[in-house]
């Protein structure tokens, strides 16, 4: 996990490593408790591991660590988000949390899935395509 202090931060030195997904999950819940003044002040996170002493850029990515995330915007579930996600992703373990720009009128959220291994940089594009094929459909736009 690489953390960025805001959308304007591109320094990659703030890393957190976890022994398992449960530890990562616990950290996600702790991050969710951090207050922020506006969306621009919200902490950002990436599954990417970057080359040492570089900035946030695709050219500096070494791999994705043991998790991935799918952003979901413009999703209409008739107030039954939990039920829809449980039905669509019952076979997967995941964490769902709202993003900084989410509102009751326009919910936006992220689904975070554990991976069984890291994704080397050369496989990220293929993995991303497969992940989006797997998660899109009638339940997720």
Describe the residue ranges of each PLM region:
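Signature for HUH/AEP ssDNA processing cores
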Residues: 1-107, 113-125
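Hydrophobic, well-ordered secondary-structure segments
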Residues: 124-128, 132
């Amino acid at each position: 996990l690489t953390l960025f202090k805001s959308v304007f931060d591109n320094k990659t030195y703030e890393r957190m490593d976890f022994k398992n997904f449960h530890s990562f999950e616990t950290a996600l819940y702790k991050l969710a408790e951090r207050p922020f003044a506006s969306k621009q002040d919200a902490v950002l996170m990436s599954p990417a591991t970057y080359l040492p002493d570089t900035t946030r850029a695709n050219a500096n990515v070494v791999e994705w660590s043991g998790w991935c995330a799918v952003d979901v915007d413009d999703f209409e579930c008739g107030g039954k988000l939990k039920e829809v996600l449980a039905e669509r992703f019952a076979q997967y373990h995941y964490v769902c949390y709202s993003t900084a720009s989410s509102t009751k009128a326009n919910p936006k959220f992220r689904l975070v899935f554990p991976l069984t291994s890291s994704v080397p940089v050369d496989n990220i594009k293929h993995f991303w395509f497969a992940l989006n094929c797997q998660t899109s459909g009638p339940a997720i736009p």
